[in-house]
Design a protein with these regions (language model features):
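A generic short-segment signal for beta-strand/edge and adjacent turn/coil regions
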Residues: 1-7, 38-42, 62-64, 91-96
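N-terminal auxiliary segments of SAM/dcSAM-dependent transferases
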Residues: 1-33
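Sparse, context-dependent recognition of short Cys/His-centered cofactor- or disulfide-binding micro-motifs
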Residues: 3-5, 28, 40, 108-111
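Pocket-edge structural micro-motifs
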Residues: 21-24, 38-40, 47
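The AdoMet/dcAdoMet-binding core of the Class I SAM-like
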Residues: 49-149
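A short, structured beta-strand/loop element
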Residues: 29-44
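Short, conserved beta-strand segments within well-ordered enzyme catalytic domains
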Residues: 19, 35-37, 71-72
Length: 149
């Protein structure tokens, strides 16, 4: 028997309670929906990710050539990263995520894009503060100062 609602993970973080849950929306013929909550606020839902894909397409459309090095701030449910990896020109993708449990969800394939991102050799995750890294030595601890497209 399929559960209509399931809490997949709960973690206490420095920002508060982080919850990953899955539900089947009966009003949409049982469509599977993933949701992320931080405390009492909804951060993201698999129902609404068109904006993430559109922003990725807009950003990458400005690039030319091959061998793009791309960095994304925030992993979430992985829709931005998955959209970037659809471009064959992306040679390397670094995704910086502030909350370690979010990276763990992808590595454990608890979220829809987990397997896709974790198995793509072009994609790496780093746990950290995107904005602090941008102000510091860069996004790749193994290659300080490296520039990205």
């Amino acid at each position: 028997m399929r559960l209509n609602f399931e809490e997949l993970d709960y973690q206490q973080t420095a920002l508060g309670e982080l919850i990953l849950r899955r539900r089947h929306a009966l009003e949409m013929d049982g469509r599977e929906v993933f949701e992320v909550k931080l405390n009492d606020e909804y951060l993201m839902s698999s129902l609404f990710h068109v904006g993430e894909v559109a922003l990725t397409d807009l950003g990458l459309a400005a690039l030319t050539g091959e061998g793009w090095d791309v960095v994304i701030g925030g992993l979430g449910l992985g829709y931005t990263a998955a959209a970037a990896l659809k471009y064959d020109q992306v040679a390397r993708l670094i995704v910086v995520e502030a909350l370690a449990p979010v990276i763990d969800w992808h590595q454990r394939e608890l979220v829809p894009n987990g397997r896709l991102l974790s198995e793509d050799a072009r994609c790496r995750y780093y746990q950290g503060d995107f904005f602090a890294l941008a102000r510091g030595d860069g996004f790749d601890p193994g290659d300080p100062g490296r520039l990205f497209d």
